[in-house]
Structure formats: C-alpha cells, structure tokens
C-alpha cells in the first residue's frame, strides 16, 4: 500500500538528508572513538537495511557488527542474508533467541499461573533482541544503533526498551518515505527499500507476512502527511490519538522525582 503513493521529494533534498545523516552518524561515533564499532540488528526490513547502508558510508564495514536474531524461525531471513551480502558486512552473527524466549514463557506461566497476554508475546522478543545486541556490544566493544523511524513510532510499532532502545538513532526523526528515499539514493536493492512493512509476527492465510498497513487500516503515507504537513485525512483523529498514546516511547529519559531541598540541607 505504502509504495503506491509517495510524498514528493526532490533529488536535492534526499541527497542533503542522506549526506546529513551520514555525517551526523560519523561525527557521533568518531567523537566517542575513531575505532568504535557499531552493533546493528539486521531483520531484512527497510529500516535496518538503510541504517546499515548509512553506517557503511559513515564508518566503513570493518566497524559494523551485524546480528541476525530469528525467534526459532524467520520466514523472511533470506532478506536479512541479502542485506549482509549486498553491503558486504563481513562481521556478522546469527543468534537464535527462540529457546530463550520459550524458556522465559514457560517460567512465567509456571510461576504466575496465567496465560501470557499479547503485550507480553509481542514485546518480549524485541526486548530479548535488544539484550542480545548489548551482549554482542559488551563482548566486542561497541555502540548499539537504534533503527526505528518516526512513522512507526507514531502508531506504536516499536517496543519501549526493546527495538526503541539503543545508543543513538540515525533515522528516528525520519518518516518511512524518507527512509525509503535515502535507501534508494544509497543504492540498496528495490526489494529491500520498498519491502512491505511488517512486524514479522502476523501471517496472512497463505503463510506470508501480514503488512502493518493492513492491520492498521490506513497507510503510512497518511501518517507521514500528518507528521510533515498536518493534513486532516480520513483517519486523522485515530492517528493523532495513537500518537498521543505512544508519546511516552519517544521520551526515553525516565520521569524522575527531583528533591527540592537536599542541596540546601547539605550546604548547611
């Protein structure tokens, strides 16, 4: 659905966005260390594919550690293999989180005597994947890159302290269409950049992945028009309501109580 209607971007604007995000990424990482590695989860979706391409331009493939993390079985793992091969990501690992996830599910059922709600089964794999990325970062030394985009954040298609975690986020303020355009500009295969967005957890009757837009009932293009132009479309109220409900995911700084008088006390 998304690919049928795209916002209009000039070639010059996309070149500028691509150059800016590459330079920003290079500066951020190199400021910490000119030899710093970056760990990225490679799902085969457009976001991780485009961020990997940005990293390649910014710091080179030798400093990228790509990690595939299927949960037992991943229907579209061929796409993540394609990303690794196409970008020449020489440092890559495939760590299956399936056994850890199902063991954890078993422990929760045993101790709580409860069936696990969708909020558990949807978000726990994402949090295990982030734990895996930080594990790799601890072993080899490196930063973990966040690959979330603004459009999917708005509708809640990211997990707090799961895929929405990380040490820096190159595309978090870019819409899906801007991510696609940058991926095209950087020369990624059309099948990767224009892949139907899907969370990988829901299937169609034929066993293929069910797209996000089918489940949402509206397109990311409509979301993007609201983000960039505040256009009052058919699903405007619904999308804005989702945006408000998911705003807490954008603000990763935890709300904290700040005592007002302690400094005065210790100054006495």
Predicted regions and their residues:
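ATP/NTP-dependent adenylation/nucleotidyl-transfer catalytic domains that generate, transfer
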Residues: 1-40, 53-57, 62-65, 71-73, ...
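Conserved G/P- and acidic residue-centered "switch" motifs that form tight phosphate/ATP-binding loops
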Residues: 45
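Conserved Walker A/P-loop ATP-binding site and its immediately adjacent core
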Residues: 76
């Amino acid at each position: 659905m998304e690919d049928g209607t795209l916002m209009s971007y000039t070639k010059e604007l996309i070149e500028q966005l691509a150059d800016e995000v590459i330079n920003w990424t290079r500066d951020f990482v190199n400021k910490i260390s000119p030899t710093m590695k970056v760990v990225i989860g490679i799902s085969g979706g457009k976001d991780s594919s485009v961020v990997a391409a940005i990293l390649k331009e910014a710091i080179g493939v030798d400093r990228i550690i790509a990690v595939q993390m299927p949960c037992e079985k991943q229907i579209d793992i061929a796409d993540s293999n394609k990303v690794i091969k196409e970008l020449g990501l020489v440092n890559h690992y495939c760590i299956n989180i399936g056994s850890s996830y199902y063991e954890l599910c078993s422990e929760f059922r045993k101790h709580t005597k409860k069936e696990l709600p969708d909020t558990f089964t949807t978000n726990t794999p994402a949090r295990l994947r982030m734990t895996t990325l930080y594990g790799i970062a601890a072993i080899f030394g490196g930063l973990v890159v966040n690959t979330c985009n603004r459009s999917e954040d708005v509708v809640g298609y990211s997990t707090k302290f799961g895929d929405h975690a990380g040490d820096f986020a190159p595309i978090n303020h870019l819409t899906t269409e801007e991510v696609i355009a940058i991926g095209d500009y950087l020369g990624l295969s059309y099948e990767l950049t224009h892949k139907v967005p899907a969370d990988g957890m829901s299937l169609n009757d034929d066993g293929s992945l069910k797209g996000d837009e089918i489940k949402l009932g509206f397109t990311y293009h409509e979301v993007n028009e609201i983000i960039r132009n505040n256009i009052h479309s058919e699903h405007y109220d619904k999308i804005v309501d989702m945006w408000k409900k998911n705003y807490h995911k954008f603000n990763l700084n935890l709300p904290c109580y700040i005592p007002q008088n302690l400094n005065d006390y210790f100054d006495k």
